[in-house]
């Protein structure tokens, strides 16, 4: 009898039965699921791999600092915390505008965000003073890229852009009051990282 009891105990332990689940002659078996734990470990590993540092989602601080230096005297200096602050603000601004433009594309069942979507988003979010100069810049940019394509015959990144920006098309997308000047003098500086490489496109200032 003792041997049978030992045998039962051995069998139970081999099946992973703990004493808490043994009651009388009934056994409750809770096998250890190695597959589930393995999947959980895999998920934890993926989660750690997909985590990014906060700085990784921001614009390069060197580019931000270069733009900031253009607005101060040559002898001026910019502290590191000031650069990081502007870096975060600019990155958040880009995300803010792009999110609104993406929502418009989603409503119109389009997958590509174009220049008009960005301008529409800026006007919707209250950045009306930037719409007119950016509209002109976008038009000049497309004309310059068109000219380069005609001369060299090279395929450029703007091939996927939508129809040429016209006054009529833009008026249909934006309220008329948002794309016309209001008589007040406003200085808006438009920066681009590629204007030096494209003929006909320069840094422009409107007043």
Curated annotation (Swiss-Prot):
Subcellular location: Nucleus
CDD domains attached to this UniProt entry: HFD_NFYB
Region listing for C domain, in residue ranges: 143-207
This protein's GO CC annotations: CCAAT-binding factor complex; chromatin; nucleoplasm; nucleus; protein-DNA complex; RNA polymerase II transcription regulator complex
Record-level GO BP terms: cellular response to leukemia inhibitory factor; positive regulation of transcription by RNA polymerase II; regulation of DNA-templated transcription; regulation of transcription by RNA polymerase II
Region (Subunit association domain (SAD)), start-end ranges: 86-97
Region B domain: start-end pairs: 53-142
Superkingdom in the source lineage: Eukaryota
Annotated keywords: Activator, DNA-binding, Isopeptide bond, Nucleus, Transcription, Transcription regulation, Ubl conjugation
Residue ranges for the DNA-binding region feature of this UniProt entry: 59-65
Modifications the protein undergoes after translation, according to the UniProt entry: Monoubiquitination at Lys-140 plays an important role in transcriptional activation by allowing the deposition of histone H3 methylations as well as histone H2B monoubiquitination at 'Lys-121'.
Region annotated A domain, chain positions: 1-52
Record text on subunit structure and interactions: Heterotrimeric transcription factor composed of three components, NF-YA, NF-YB and NF-YC. NF-YB and NF-YC must interact and dimerize for NF-YA association and DNA binding. Interacts with C1QBP.
Family as reported in the entry's similarity comment: Belongs to the NFYB/HAP3 subunit family.
Name this polypeptide is given: Nuclear transcription factor Y subunit beta
Source organism phylogeny: Eukaryota, Metazoa, Chordata, Craniata, Vertebrata
């Amino acid at each position: 009898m003792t041997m049978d009891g030992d045998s039962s105990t051995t069998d139970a332990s081999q099946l992973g039965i703990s004493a808490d689940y043994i009651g009388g002659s009934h056994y409750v078996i809770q096998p250890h699921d190695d597959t589930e734990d393995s999947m959980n470990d895999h998920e934890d590993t993926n989660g750690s791999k997909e985590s990014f540092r906060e700085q990784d989602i921001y614009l390069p601080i060197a580019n931000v600092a270069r733009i900031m230096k253009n607005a101060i005297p040559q002898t001026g200096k910019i502290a590191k915390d000031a650069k990081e602050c502007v870096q975060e603000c600019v990155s958040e601004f880009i995300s803010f505008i792009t999110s609104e433009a993406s929502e418009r594309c989603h409503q119109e069942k389009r997958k590509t965000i174009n220049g008009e979507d960005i301008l529409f988003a800026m006007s919707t979010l209250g950045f009306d003073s930037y719409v007119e100069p950016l509209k002109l810049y976008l038009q000049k940019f497309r004309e310059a890229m068109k000219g380069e394509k005609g001369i060299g015959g090279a395929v450029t990144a703007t091939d996927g852009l939508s129809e040429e920006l016209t006054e009529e098309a833009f008026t249909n997308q934006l309220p008329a009051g948002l794309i016309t000047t209001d008589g007040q003098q406003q200085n808006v500086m438009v920066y681009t990282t590629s204007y030096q490489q494209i003929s006909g496109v320069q840094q422009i200032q409107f007043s």
